[in-house]
Amino acid sequence: MLAVRIYNTLTRKKEEFKPLVPGQISMYVCGPTVYNYIHIGNARSSIAFDTIRRYFEYKGYQVKYVSNFTDVDDKMINEARAEKITVPELAEKFINAFLEDTTALNIEPATLHPRATHEIKDIINFVKVLIDKGYAYEVDGDVYYRAKKFQHYGELSDQNIEQLEEGASEHINDEEQNRKEDPIDFALWKAQKGPDEIAWDSPWGKGRPGWHIECSVMSTKYLGNTIDIHGGGQDLEFPHHENEIAQSEAKTDQKFVNYWMHNGFVTVGKDQEKMSKSLHNFVTVHDILRKIDPQVLRFFMASVQYRRQINYSEENLKQAATILDRFKNTLTNINYRIADDTPTKTSEDLVKAINETEEKFVAAMDDDFNVQNALTSIYDLLPVVNANANSDNVDKDALKLFEEKLAAWLLVFGVDIKKLCAQTTGSNDEEIEELVSKRDEARNNKDWATSDQIRDQLKEMGITIQDTPQGTRWTRD
């Protein structure tokens, strides 16, 4: 098995991937805070790491994939109050919405989807260990982490303590300044602010966990003290992932993660502004899937290398749809030939081209999941396949091999060729077949005017007609 090379955010270089257990991968990806529908930017992370997971599975690895739900924090509390429902009710609503959206996008379910509120006992025990080891301290029911005590603090985000303290001092209020030993200390446990705020009993009084501690607890509980891969958006690199390292390694005295991976942002508009809820420039997956095919959105977002930014636009979505149509039309074309009565002949050149494409596909994906090069290798094969399918020397066995390989390659990107070929956007297949039959009848009767009229009608419907010795074929444009 050829080695995958991964860009490790911690070391800032590509490294050969070596799992802790040969043939098995432990993978943790930070999930959503479930106070609203996910937007396209949130979905980028889910799609990027699902694509990476699928490629590992394509190579034969067993992947244990854990992705959490943050179901309690300030945003959850504020939104629940605004909707006049409880925090658990809000969480249930948007967890279900998340699962519906990700299912529509053909994102594989996580092996486990732990929820922060289901792990309170373990969170409290984790915090107690940090206090006992001198890494945390309690102030009036709040518990803070002593960031400066952890000697590697700032390494993931490539910042030194002085830079971090200067940045933190600009954002801390007077009350926090008086409570914290240092501006860069962060909350592990937050005291209840009022009797109506959701809270749990703890050794420090009623309260709830901080955001960062939740992921440390859930990742180490379900994947062990050291994890192969930890992923998330670039915006989580600091402070969230930096704090996860500090918490986890202080508790376990072991390396927390071997490979840190961060996906790029989704941008919008000519200025390519980052999509975010705070900037009010976001589009939810829930809304966009009412307008476009889920496979188009999925393929569009999976077809850009995970570390690069994606510019979300209608034009780019149309380009993705056009590429999927090329795949679909090729599959339609070869299935016509496989099903017809033409005897099959052996084409060593086509088989060789398919095998060479597979080598190029694997080489590209092994290079930090270079999806653009991987897809280019497939695109370059399509004319070769179609040329064989349209020739008198058709190799049906090779066409079947191509279809099998294409199904596996596209599934890495979350595209199911059975669903792709079953799509009936616009006119349905029966209507088209009826018009094609009428045109064939007109041609047989040498009624060229009617034949041309039907061809023009089909063209307006987005259907291209091809007359071959084996009969009339049609494809959607």
From Swiss-Prot:
ATP binds at K277. A motif ('KMSKS' region) lies at residues 274-278. One of its GO terms (molecular function) is ATP binding. The keyword Ligase applies. GO terms for biological process: cysteinyl-tRNA aminoacylation. Its EC number is 6.1.1.16. Binds 1 zinc ion per subunit. Pfam families: CysS_C (PF23493), DALR_2 (PF09190), tRNA-synt_1e (PF01406). It is an enzyme of class 6 (ligase). It is found in: Cytoplasm. Signal peptide: none annotated. Zn(2+) binds at C30, C215, H240, E244. It comes from the Bacteria. GO terms for cellular component: cytosol. It catalyses: tRNA(Cys) + L-cysteine + ATP = L-cysteinyl-tRNA(Cys) + AMP + diphosphate. Its cofactor is Zn(2+). Keywords: Aminoacyl-tRNA synthetase, ATP-binding, Cytoplasm, Ligase, Metal-binding, Nucleotide-binding, Protein biosynthesis, Zinc. A motif ('HIGH' region) lies at residues 32-42. HAMAP family: Cys_tRNA_synth (MF_00041). Belongs to the class-I aminoacyl-tRNA synthetase family. Monomer. PANTHER family: CYSTEINE--TRNA LIGASE, CYTOPLASMIC, CYSTEINYL-TRNA SYNTHETASE. NCBIfam families: cysS. This is Cysteine--tRNA ligase. It comes from Lactobacillus acidophilus (strain ATCC 700396 / NCK56 / N2 / NCFM). The lineage of its organism: Bacteria, Bacillati, Bacillota, Bacilli, Lactobacillales. The gene is cysS.
